[in-house]
Amino acid sequence: VILLLITSTPSVDARLKAKDNMPLASFHDNAKRTLQTRLINTRCCPGKPCCRIG
């Protein structure tokens, strides 16, 4: 009987999630992609006066 209960329970997603229930890995990928796009668009590096990001 116990084995039937264990197999019938819904699976648990063990990945870390952000506040809006979005997986953190996806959140970090989106942030990285956005930063790379902005660096390409501005053609500068963070820490330099020309850069609009940092």
Swiss-Prot record:
For this UniProt record, the keywords arranged alphabetically read as follows:
Amidation, Disulfide bond, Hydroxylation, Ion channel impairing toxin, Neurotoxin, Secreted, Signal, Toxin
Location of 4-hydroxyproline modifications: 49
Q: Which residues form the signal peptide?
A: 1-14
Q: What is its main location?
A: secreted
Modifications made to the protein after synthesis: Contains 2 disulfide bonds that can be either 'C1-C3, C2-C4' or 'C1-C4, C2-C3', since these disulfide connectivities have been observed for conotoxins with cysteine framework V (for examples, see AC P0DQQ7 and AC P81755).
In terms of superkingdom, the source organism counts as Eukaryota
Gene Ontology MF: a single term:
toxin activity
A Pfam family hit: Chi-conotoxin
Please give the tissue specificity annotation from the record for this chain: Expressed by the venom duct.
Task: Please name the InterPro entries in this protein's record.
Answer: T-conotoxin
| Compartments it resides in | Secreted
Q: State which residues form the propeptide.
A: 15-42
Q: Provide the Gene Ontology terms for cellular component.
A: extracellular region
Q: Which residues carry this modification: Isoleucine amide?
A: 53
What does the entry note on its domains? The cysteine framework is V (CC-CC).
Entry's family note: Belongs to the conotoxin T superfamily.
Q: What else is known?
A: Negative results: does not have the ability to interact with the G-protein coupled somatostatin type 3 receptor (SSTR3).
Q: What is this protein called?
A: Conotoxin vc5a
Supply the source organism for this entry.
Conus victoriae
Organism taxonomic ancestry: Eukaryota, Metazoa, Spiralia, Lophotrochozoa, Mollusca
